[in-house]
Every structure is written in C-alpha cells, then in structure tokens.
Amino acid sequence: TDLLASRHIGINEQDTTVMLRKIGVDSLDELIEKTIPANIRLKEPLALNAPLTEYEFGKHIAELAGKNKLYTTYIGMGWYNTITPAVIQRNVFENPVWYTSYTPYQTEVSQGRLEALMNFQTAICDLTAMPLANCSLLDEATAAAEAVSMMYALRSRAQQKAGANVVFVDENIFPQTLAVMTTRAVPQGIELRVGKYKEFEPSQEVFACVLQYPNSNGSVEDYTEFTEKAHAADCKVAVAADILSLALLTPPGEWGADIVFGTTQRLGTPMFYGGPSAGYFATRDEYKRNMPGRIIGWSKDKYGKLCYRMALQTREQHIKREKATSNICTAQALLATMAGFYAVYHGQEGITTIASRIHSITVFLDKQLKKFGYTQVNAQYFDTLRFELPEHVSAQQIRTIALSKEVNLRYFENGNVGFSIDETTDVAAANVLLSIFAIAAGKDYQKVDDIPEKSNIDKTVKRTTPFLTHEVFNKYHTETEMMRYIKRLDRKDISLAQSMISLGSCTMKLNAAAEMLPLSRPEFMGMHPLVPEDQAEGYRELINNLSEDLKIITGFAGVSLQPNSGAAGEYTGLRVIRAYLESIGQGHRNKILIPASAHGTNPASAIQAGFITVTCACDEQGNVDMDDLCAKAEENKEELAALMITCPSTHGIFETEIKDICHIIHACGAQVYMDGANMNAQVGLTNPGFIGADVCHLNLHKTFASPHGGGGPGVGPICVAEHLVPFLPGHGIFGNAQNQVSSAPFGSAGILPITYGYIRMMGTEGLTMATKIAILNANYLAACLKDTYGIVYRGANGFVGHEMILECRKVHEETGISENDIAKRLMDYGYHAPTLSFPVHGTLMIEPTESESLAELDNFVDVMLNIWQEIQEVKNGEADKDDNVLINAPHPEYEIVSDRWEHPYTREKAAYPIESVRENKFWINVARVDNTLGDRKLLPTRYGTFE
C-alpha cells in the first residue's frame, strides 16, 4: 500500500469487475483492445525504473536537493531572492484548494480566485500607473514578445501600408528577453533593431520601441523625452519594468508608456531555478481588445449582486482560434494569486519599506566600494551596481574570493563585476560583500552594525504618487486577518478538494502530496537559474532523469523542458519544425493542416509561428475525414510544413487510421505534430513516436500530475524525433539562443519535481494501469449515461477513449434547456461543470481521470440522472419552462435563505436535490452572472464601479 499507484488510482479490482459488467466486456484488457487500434499498441512495456515507495521517494528527493548548493546569489538579471510570507506559503502555495482548482471559466464557483486575481491586476495597475492589466503571462521574456506582437497588430493604416516592421530595442535589455523576442519576431516578419536609446532616430519603418527600466546594468534612465519623441513619430513604447522598483521610481504610466510588462517574481515568489513566476502585462484601456492573456473584470449576478468574471473572452484562442490576439491559454494564476496576496499583506507602506531598505543597502555599498578604488558606472540606480575594477584587480580574483565565501556575483563580458541587492540582504550579508571587494583590492574594511536609510534617486525619476490605496491592501496586515481573508476566498471555489472536476481535455487528476512536498524545500525554492552548474547538481540530475523518462514514455529521442505551457509547447514544436525545414532547403513550406476539431491553441500557435492554417474536415463519426485530408494534403503538397493532430482526438476517440494519416503527411515531405493534450489515454499503451509523429508536446499539468493552479503554472515540454534534436531550444546566456522560448533555461524548473515524483513512484505498471483505468472510468460513465443524454462519438468498436461527449442538443431543441443550464445546475449539486460546447457546440465533454473512486463516479451519475429527471419535468410540463431549477441555477446561499421565495419549486429542491448533497453541500456565493455587462463596461481593478 506504500506504492503511489494504490493511492493515486481510485478503482480497485472489485470495482473494475462491477464496471466492466456495466460496460459489457469481460476484462480490462478486452476493453483496451477494443478502444485502442491494434496497429498502434506498444509491443513491450515501458523501460522505466522500478517504482519507489512514497517514503523512498522522499529520501531520494532529499538526496537530490542536498546536491544543490545554496550560495548567496546577487546575479539579478530578472531573478532575486525573496521572502515568501509564511502565511501565503502555507495557506495558498501548499493548499490544495488553491493549487487543484481550474481556470475560472465557471464564474459562480470561482469567486475566490477571481477576487485574488483582481487584487493582482489592481496591484499591477497601481504600481505601473496603467489603467488595465491582465491576470498574468508566462514570464517577462514572453511578455516582451507578446508586447511586440500586440504593437505590430496596432500599427496605423499608414504604417501597415508603408510596411513598417521594425522594433527599436535598447541595447541594455536583459539578454534572455531579447532572445525570446527574436524567436517570436522572426516568423512574423518583424525586425528587431538593437541600439542606444539616446541615439534613436524615428523612421518610417519603425513602429515600436522596447526599453528596460531600470536597465540591464541597473541604471535608471529618464525616458520621458525619448517617449515623447517616439510618440511624435507614431511609435508605441513598451517598457520592461522591475515591479518592486516602481515603489520608489516614477512609474512608466506617468511618463507615457503604452505597455508596461515584466515579472512579479520579486513579490514573494521564490526563484525556483528560473520559474515559475507570474509575468505581468499592463496597457491602455483603448488597447484592451488586442491585449494577450486573461482579464478579470467586475459584473453583477442576475439579482444585481457585484461579482467577478473573466472578461472579453472573445479575444482568446478558445473562441477566436487563428484570429486570436495570442495563443496563450494556461498562464501563471497560482503565482499571480501569491503576488497579489503579497501586495495585500504588505500594502504600500510595507512594499515601500522593503524597496527602500534594498536601495539603502545598495547606496551604502556603492559609497564603500568607491573608497576601495572601484568605479561604479550607474549614476541612478535602484538595487543594481556595476563596477569597473582597479587596474590591479581582476574579475577572476573577485570570483575566487566570492566563491570561497559562497557568494555569486554577476560577471560582465568586458571584465566588469556587478551585483543586485534583494529583500533578503541584511547587514551581515552586506559586510560579506564589502569583504570580498576589499580583499580583492588589498584594502582594509570595517564591519558595520547598521546601514542608514539613504536614497540617491533624483527627483526627476522619483515616485511621488500613492499606490495600493484600495482598502483590500490596508486591512489584512496581521497574520490572523490575512489567514482568514485567504480562507474566506477559498471557501467560494470548487477545487479537487471538494469533488471531481470532470472537465474534458483537462485531465484533472490527483496532485499527490508526496509529489508536492519537495516544492517547499529551500534547496529547490532558492536556486537562481544562472548559478554555476556545479551548484545546481541536484536540479541538473532531476532534469536529466525526467528528460530520459519522458523520452521513454513518448518514444522520442530528444526533450526540451523550456516551454511554460501547452500552448508554448505547441509554438516551440512548430519553431523546431520550421528550423528543420529551413536546414534541408524546404523553408518555403508555410502551411499547417489542422482538423476542425483541434484545440483553439493549435491554429493560434501556427499563426504566431508564421504559418498559414488549412482546416481539414471531420466525418460524422468524429474522425478526420480521410478524403478531405488527402485532398488538402495533395493540394498543398509543395507548401505543406506539418499536420497538427491530437490522439486520441479531441472527440475522445482513437482514430483507426492515425498511422495512415502520418504516412500521407510524410509522403508530402511534411512533419507530424502531435498535440499531447490527451496523452492520459496513451501512456504505457501507445506513444507518439510509435504512432509516427515527429514532435509532440506534453502537458505536465494534465497527464503528469502537476496541478492546474487555477490557470497555471503549467509545463509544456516538447519531445522530438532524432532528426529534430539539433533544433531544440537553447539559451542565450549559455551561448546558444536558438529557438529560445522562455526567460529561464529550463522554464518552470521549480515544478518539475512533481512530474519526476509521479513517474518515479508510479513506475511502468502504475502508469500503464492509470491509463487503463482512465479509459475504464470514461467508458463506465458513457455506459451509465448513454440511454438518457446519449454519447456523441464512439470509436470503431463502440467505445470512447479517456473522455466522452455528452449529447445535449436534443434536450435544448425539446425543452429550451441548454448545456449551460445543465452546467450551472451541477453547481447546486457541488460539482464543477464539464467542458462546455467544445469540441462540439451544444454538448458537454466529460473526463473523469483515473483518480476518482467508484463511489464518486456513481454519485456523479446519480446527479446527472437526477438532472435528467428535472429536464423531463420541463419537457412534460410538470415544471414551468420559464421558472425552473435549471434555468435559475445556480441557487446561491443568500437566495435560499431569503425571506422572499417566489419560485414554483421548493427551496429544498433547489439546494438539496438529492440526499448525498446534504453530506457535502457547497454553498454558492453568487447567482448566475451577467456575462454581457462585464464586457460592455470593462472594470479591471478593485476601484471599478458601475455607477
């Protein structure tokens, strides 16, 4: 019982027998044989290591963590030591209510995290002095790339006519940001022109500028005149700003920036060897429809109660597909939530104190090191100093002394040395820094006992305006109040801690505690991504081991863990394909074939990667229409770069002709990209390499047990065949910026221990059984619900894969009750809705995963059948078609206990429709939310009002 598989998989042998009988097969193997085509079944089990028990894995991960050397690091460059308030670490980061919830599409059961994300947006708007912010992007570098794409889309008619395609980038931008911007700009035909901002001259071809504030050297420049000059030439200005510095520096919004972006890692998020942390993005209100990422806004429920919702979703990939403003889907919701709570806990005074303390220590060290003969090059700075060394001192000398004291500094290519002070730097640490530079220069130094409050920030760049003035940032500064505020919010949300979340295509499985615990180890939390390799041996070993495991599971030869989400993985895979085609003289191939049933990120990613999409039809059984595929492949043969396909398809079925499909595409000289969103039906039974794909991405936050976090963090690694390995993403700081897609070399390295633990503790047998049970559970639900709702698509032998689509269109025709009404009614029973109207409009897609027990599956069936009865009551005239439990759902607590009750059905029917609800009632906070109000008037901060 100490093996994870017995805890992770919710179904035992006895349950399996009962379920197989209901499905109508004699054995689990028979079910699998009838579900997965024989020609793609693996002949041998996966050659993974034997599984570790939870206890053994705990010891193993402790050994790996012990190989990481946690030196005091002042490298900076976008990553800094922080202090995560314990109340946030324990009650948010380590709390399954926060980390197991899904993206808040279902507004009424997401009010807690919507408020937390609204706090984040408000903090960003206040600190940047911009009117609009989204609720996170993947990291600073991808935010920069998104800014460039957005400004390109916003070009004036005259600029478009003139073919303006140049972005001016100041040379003192972080190198990793420039590398990712380059990756993303090239396929869109955008040229990045790097130079000195003081020498910038506008010209007809330049449509935008990107600046860093403070810049990469740490210098704080006054960009006011530059911005005026750019605007006079109709150039937009985007600024990468250190969010903590804006407590002391004039915010870019006050000197005219059009976009302000960056990372909120400094707001209490550990460095995690590079990620995850929440990127931020703020802009002007008039650009809201071009803005990437999710935006939280105010709305009202049907009784007029104020509430939150995700606004302007029609911009996003799941609706707009190839016309979307961005391919982003999963972002960094959990980290944005934590950064928002950090702002709530500290408020303006606390954040200003932290920033001032950092700055004072920096001023003190600047003055002291000048006495030792060092020349500091930044006239104005916040936390970062860059020194020219005295003639008799070398950077190597300083490095040797620093390493002997377990300190990492920043070493510039020209021999300069620098450092960035952070929230954790105290007097003792400052004394160590003093000693390093004094010893190198052969000077005496005096230890100090105290460092006075001092500022060298000139009034031209000094902040004078207040921020975080809303009461939420001024009420919760004691731990008791903060703990209760967090609890008050988490009670409003459905997560896996409450009940099954059956979202199709999302794989909401168990995120086991044994997998999650290592994330809180200081050796994993406190590691800067640019430390010397010998200090990160534990991380490197974990990354190598995990990469080998993923190669075995997918049947591929190479892996990149850099992409921070599934959509980022899609983009990366397509960039790799493009690079390969260019290398063999086939760079003219620019078309991607995509089935009509594909996830919206597929066409959006293809467009971002500079391709043209060609849609291929599906037949009545939900398979790719082979005639249409052959015709489109032949028609576009010379220009075809790749096919993007999901297996099993988004319709939840294994296509019998998948191998033939791969062969047809390869015969055209093109590549096959497999979307790994449905990998939970493949692991151990088949794999993309065996099927015939060339590249696939995985969603570690689906198949491989990493949590969804309410909308991120995710990891979207790509796995590739041998011929594509040379084109995998590199990292500029390590000398190879080819196809770089994330700020950090290994993307969100900090959450890789989860998937590593899942694979190491499940082993071949456990992983394979998990896949079989996921398929069993989906077929069991299909068998239980087929005679009422009906199942839209089935495979060749009448079975579904790991998910199935529930037919709701006939119900709507006969009764007016929609799939949305059913989804909202499920909330009254304590369940999150399945996936609505994807991939087929007017349906619900259900994916139970392997983690649910038979008791939970049966309860869900009881609920769905009871809702079916409620639908029949409307159909038969027993219930009022204009006033019934379905169209009025969900029923919030305040309505149930109200003095007025004017519905023709009882309060009990509304709130306790079946007995099991009494044991685990989830009280909803708001009635059905008005979706149009919040879009007509977008209010993206806590200060918003409809009056």
Regions found by a protein language model. Give the residues of each.
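TRNA-binding/sensing appendages of the translation machinery
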Residues: 25-39, 257-262, 693-696
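Conserved phosphate/anionic-ligand binding catalytic regions in large, soluble enzymes, centered on
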Residues: 269-282, 286-287, 331-335, 420, ...
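Conserved PLP-enzyme active-site core in the AAT-like
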Residues: 112, 142-307, 369, 382, ...
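Non-catalytic terminal extensions of PLP-dependent enzymes
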Residues: 1-22, 34-74, 83-99, 105-111, ...
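Short helix-loop-beta connector
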Residues: 130-131, 161, 555-557, 586-588
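A conserved hydrophobic secondary-structure block that centers on an alpha-helix together
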Residues: 123-144, 163, 167
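Flexible, glycine/proline-enriched loop segments at strand-loop-helix junctions
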Residues: 104-112, 132-136, 165-172, 212, ...
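General small-molecule cofactor/ligand-binding pocket signal
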Residues: 133, 191-195, 377, 410, ...
